């Protein structure tokens, strides 16, 4: 009995197991149903939320206006920046084109200009420059030639003002170097010729002073004057000449002063002034002879018999004796 009961289970034992399984199945189905209901309620609730979200942008009309206002302001600034960028790009492109043009074309115009800058050398030869009226024609020709070379350079390159200083400096330096070499070559050996030119060089010092004022750049070339080094060393400077010139009697001679430059030497040389007409003279004898024209005095008188002519200047009396009286010379009598 006990063994049979152990081998074949009773109904009381089998029923609880079936019930426990049914309970488990029912609980699983219930959980599944709850999960389906919960998911169905979630997915059913989501479309209502999406529809309500899709309806929210429609009622307010102000956000598009704000967006348009926000977009309109940057568009103006962007346009301004684009305009500035376009202008800068155009300027940069023009600068690049000018640089390429300057890199491609500079040789032929400069080669054609350099022969035109060379002709200032012929006026500086002894036959034309130094034996003419002072040295002002040579300096004026040099300045005129350099100015013409500058004008030619500016005319050949009107579009590139930035690149002009270097070729003009080169042309001016080359022309001045050739002028200095041509001027120093014929006057290097004869030293006495410097002393022969010492007296007529004095009137030309205003032109050299003006030449220094026109070219105030000592760094480009060391000796801007076309004179040789020996003659410039013997000549005093214009500022120092005012102190030396009254002492040197050779330069005070009135024959070496042209009429155009007599006014510039009035303070230094013309120290003797007439009290009647305020005319200045460089020597007291000249002032005394001039004073005879105001007083009417004629101290020099011809001593030939039967003549008796009086003269205010002794040279006039000598001329009268040579022209009218061809006899023996007679001692001059001066009336006190």
From Swiss-Prot:
PROSITE patterns: ZINC_FINGER_C2H2_1, ZINC_FINGER_C2H2_2. GO terms for biological process: regulation of gene expression. Transcription factor that controls morphogenesis and virulence. Acts as a positive regulator of gliotixin and protease production. GO terms for cellular component: nucleus. Its main location: nucleus. Residues 1-245 are annotated as: Disordered. This is C2H2 finger domain transcription factor mtfA. It is found in: Nucleus. InterPro entries: Zinc_finger, Znf_C2H2_sf, Znf_C2H2_type. Keywords: Metal-binding, Nucleus, Repeat, Transcription, Transcription regulation, Virulence, Zinc, Zinc-finger. Residues 136-149, 182-210 have a biased composition (Low complexity). Pfam families: zf-C2H2. A zinc finger (C2H2-type) spans 272-294, 300-325. The gene is mtfA. The lineage of its organism: Eukaryota, Fungi, Dikarya, Ascomycota, Pezizomycotina.
């Amino acid at each position: 009995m006990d063994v049979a009961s152990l081998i074949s289970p009773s109904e009381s034992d089998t029923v609880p197991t079936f019930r426990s399984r049914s309970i488990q199945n029912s609980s699983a189905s219930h959980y599944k149903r709850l999960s389906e209901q919960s998911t169905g309620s979630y997915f059913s609730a989501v479309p209502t939320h999406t529809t309500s979200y899709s309806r929210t942008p429609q009622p307010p009309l102000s956000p598009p206006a704000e967006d348009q206002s926000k977009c309109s302001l940057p568009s103006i600034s962007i346009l301004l920046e684009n305009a500035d960028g376009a202008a800068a790009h155009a300027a940069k492109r023009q600068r690049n084109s000018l640089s390429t043009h300057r890199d491609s074309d500079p040789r032929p115009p400069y080669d054609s200009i350099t022969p035109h800058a060379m002709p200032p050398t012929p006026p500086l030869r002894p036959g034309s420059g130094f034996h003419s009226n002072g040295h002002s024609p040579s300096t004026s020709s040099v300045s005129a030639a350099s100015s013409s070379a500058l004008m030619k350079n500016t005319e050949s390159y009107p579009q590139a003002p930035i690149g002009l200083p270097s070729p003009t400096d080169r042309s001016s330096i080359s022309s001045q170097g050739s002028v200095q070499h041509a001027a120093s070559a014929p006057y290097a050996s004869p030293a006495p010729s410097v002393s022969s030119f010492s007296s007529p060089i004095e009137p030309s010092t205003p032109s050299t002073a003006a030449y220094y004022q026109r070219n105030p750049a000592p760094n480009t070339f060391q000796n801007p004057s076309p004179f040789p080094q020996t003659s410039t060393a013997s000549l005093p400077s214009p500022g120092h000449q005012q102190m030396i010139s009254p002492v040197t009697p050779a330069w005070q001679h009135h024959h070496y002063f042209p009429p155009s430059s007599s006014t510039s030497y009035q303070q230094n040389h013309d120290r003797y002034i007439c009290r009647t007409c305020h005319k200045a003279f460089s020597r007291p004898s000249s002032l005394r002879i001039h004073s005879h024209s105001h007083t009417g005095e004629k101290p020099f008188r011809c001593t030939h018999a039967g003549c008796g002519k009086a003269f205010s200047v002794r040279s006039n009396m000598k001329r009268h004796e040579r022209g009218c009286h061809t006899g023996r010379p007679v001692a001059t009598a001066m009336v006190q």
